[in-house]
C-alpha cells in the first residue's frame, strides 16, 4: 500500500494530528535497515526527507529491536496498520506515527487475487493494461531474471576459484539437464576435473569415458535389469569401463551417485547418456569454450558454437545394452534456443557485469529480443489473457513473474497486481 500509494480517500494524519502529504514513498529496501529510503513527505506543510519503516502493529518496532538500532534513528515516519504503543528510537526520541487503514476496495480486490482459482488470477485486468505499463514491467522482470541468473553464475565462479571457463562449463552442463536433470548435471560438472581432462582432450573416447564414468553411468546396476546381460557383451561398454578404471586411478577420481539422475517420464533423447555424449563431443571439438562464446556476435553464430551431436555408438543406443534405430541425435532447434537463452545470454550478461563491459550485456538483451518466445504453459496462459508475447525476453519475463510473484502471492509487489488493486 505504501509503495504504490494505495491510500484511503480521507486525509492522512499522524497520531499527533499532523497533516501528512506523501510526495515520494521512497526507495523500497529489500536488505537490512528501514523499509524505504529517502522518502519525501510533508508534515503540516513542512517537507521532510528520510526513511520510513512499515509495521503491522507499532509494537513490532520493539519486537524487531529497532529501538536499539542506530540505523533506524533517521526514520521520519513509522507507518502501521495499528498504533498500539508509542515508538522511540535508540536516542529515546518518539517517532512520528501514521496509522494507515486499508481502503475497502483494495482489501476486496486483494482477497480476490488470493482466492481466484485460475492462473493468472488478475486475468480480468490484462486487456485494459496500457502498452507502456506492460512494456516497462516486462523489461524490469527481464532484467531481474538476468540478475538472479548472474548471482548464480557468480556463485559458481567463486566455487570454481575464480575460473570463469570452468563456471561456464558448469552453467552449460546444468542447462543440458533441461529442467528435470539440471541439479544432477550441475553436480556432475563439479565432479569433472577439467584441467585433468584437458590432457586427454584430443581423444574423444577418453573424454566420453571420463564424462560417463564421473556421472556414475558405467556401473552395471545403473542399467535396467533387462539390458544388463546385453551390456556385459557390449564391447563399447566394456572398453569405456576399462578406460575409466585406468583414468580414475590416474587422476584419483570419484564418481557421483548415479541415483541423482532421473529417468522417469523422460524422453529418450533427454537421457543423461545422450546429453553427456553431446557434451563430450562439444568439449572435444574445442568450439564451445568461453572465448568462442564471447566472440559470437549473433544468435546464428552462438548456435554454431553450441551445435553438437552424439558419438557413433549413441546413434544406435539410448542406454547401454539396448539398440535403437540409427539417429544422429543432433541438438534440436528447440533445445538450442533454450541453451542460448539460459546459458549464452546469462553468461554474456554476467561476464559483462563482472568486467564492466556493457557490450556483452547489450548483446545478451539483443539475443533475447531476436529469439522467438518460449512455448510453455506459462507463456500460453498469459497469451490467452491477451498479453502480447513477442520474443524470448518476454517469455523470460513471464517465467520470472510466475516464479517470483504469482507463486508467492506477491501481488502487492507486482505492477499488474497494482493495477488490479487500484480499480
Region locations from a protein language model:
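Active-site ExK catalytic segment of metal-dependent nucleases
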Residues: 49-57, 78-80
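Cysteine-cluster motifs in flexible loop/terminal segments that predominantly coordinate metals
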Residues: 396-423
